[in-house]
Amino acid sequence: MSAWNALTYEGKDTILRVVREEAERMFAMAEAPGAWEAPTAAGDWQVRDVIGHIVDTTEGYFHSFEVARAGSSREVHGLPAMHELAGAGGRSFRGVPQSEMMSRVRTDLDKILDLLGGISEEEWGSFMAPHAYMGPVPPSIYAGGQLMDYGVHSWDIREGIGRAHAISADAADLLVPYMFIVWQYTIRASADLSPFTIGLTVTGRNAGSYRISISEQGMSYEPGDVSDLPTVLDFDAGGLVLTAFGRINGGNARGNLELADRFLNLFYRI
């Protein structure tokens, strides 16, 4: 298995290293003069709300693991509720001074990296902790969640600054395997799920081609040849990540463009 696929244990050290790197870059931006109340590309969030969101989310992760270790459960809200609840959670810290929030987010980062760093190979993909929005998921998903927060929201902060910029290749490459899971969890309740299959190719350290099938059961995917399919979407790693998160409309489509449009509009954006 690849050290760049953090859904496997072989990728654990890589993703935890990149989470730390992305976090430190975010912290530097958040502490820049005048940045705290600056706008971002995450809806109406300001930079301080991004930091608040990460504190709220990370401390929720601690609770999830405590609950799981105790053999208990917690309320699961479902991903459709995440936009509203996560936004409220992030904004709830607006009255807390910047210095206090930055100290708290750094402490939380150290704690979550220690927690995830101590997860065994056996538990990385099998120990189930109840995520507030996704339900029971393994530690590999929590690591991905940290990289999504620090990687994608760093992109949001840079986008808010208004200068040309790019998502880091390390973050994007690591997030590629998670994007198929994001799509599985974000299909609109009103979506037309009459069956079809399309192809998707992606470049980077997790380069490959995938067959994605839609049916009444939702979305499934598997690696495979896509040359026989009516539509193929081509992405680089950053384009796939930012498209799956609704930040851009990226990639290019080959073949039946109407089918490509139908697929890309199946999902609500988080």
Name every feature range the model reports, one short phrase each.
Residues 1-13, 61-118, 122:
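Short, helix-capping/interhelical loops that line the mouth of catalytic, cofactor-
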Residues 1-40:
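Non-cleavable N-terminal signal-anchor transmembrane helices
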Residues 2, 36-80, 129-188:
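Short, contiguous alpha-helical
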Residues 22-25, 29, 57, 108-111, ...:
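Amphipathic, well-ordered alpha-helical segments in soluble domains
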Residues 27-40, 110-142:
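Acidic interhelical loop/turn segments
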Residues 172-212:
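A glycine-rich beta-turn/hairpin centered on an aromatic-Pro dipeptide
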Residues 202-232:
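Acidic/His-leaning functional-site neighborhoods
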